[in-house]
Amino acid sequence: MIPRHFALLAGAALLTACASSGAPASLTRMGPEAARERARADSLRYPYTKADIDFMSGMIHHHAQAIQIAEWAPSRGASPALIRLTERIINAQTDEIRLMQTWLRDRNLEVPTPNPAGMPMKMNGMDHVMPMPGMLTDAQLRQLDAARGPEFDRLFLTFMIQHHRGAVTMVDTLLASNGAALDETVFKFAADVSVDQTTEIKRMLQMLLEGNTP
């Protein structure tokens, strides 16, 4: 039997193919704003679980740290190749944070403020921050912050590979949760994160192997 999360990720290709074939005729006859409202209303019919909420909320903070360290690249003497990579990361993950915030807002759920340190939570009445899988530790952040030039490039790639692998782990955890990812938006987003970040991991490993040459 194929594990559930592998079967779900395999289905992402079919979902994407169906989406690319065009919107339903009823939507194409509407104006853009009406079509968006109809699509939003349709999406609200899908069930969602606490695992879905935790995933969407947690990934906001996970993405926030990736954006934070990517924004350091220009001022740390990063190579042109690395700066191009960081620009892609910033653009893609900024858009994805908006998607996650919209999903939560549309369901009248709490929309967290992005926190690069991790997910804020209370334990024994005190505020704590829970890091997500793969997120950089304080020591790693200080090490990267102090690095310059080729050393920054090397550390950034090493740490971002770690960070991306953590995101893939979060997707695997979601898809292994009973009843999770039945919501179309959550499923497609999770599948995109897994596929896109796995692809970027391979690219970054190659950049490390080649010494990060443009």
Describe the residue ranges of each PLM region.
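Bacterial N-terminal signal peptides that target proteins for export
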Residues: 1-8
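All-alpha RGS (Regulator of G-protein Signaling) helical domain and cognate RGS-like helical scaffolds
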Residues: 20-214
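C-terminal motif of bacterial Sec signal peptides marking the signal peptidase cleavage site
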Residues: 15-17
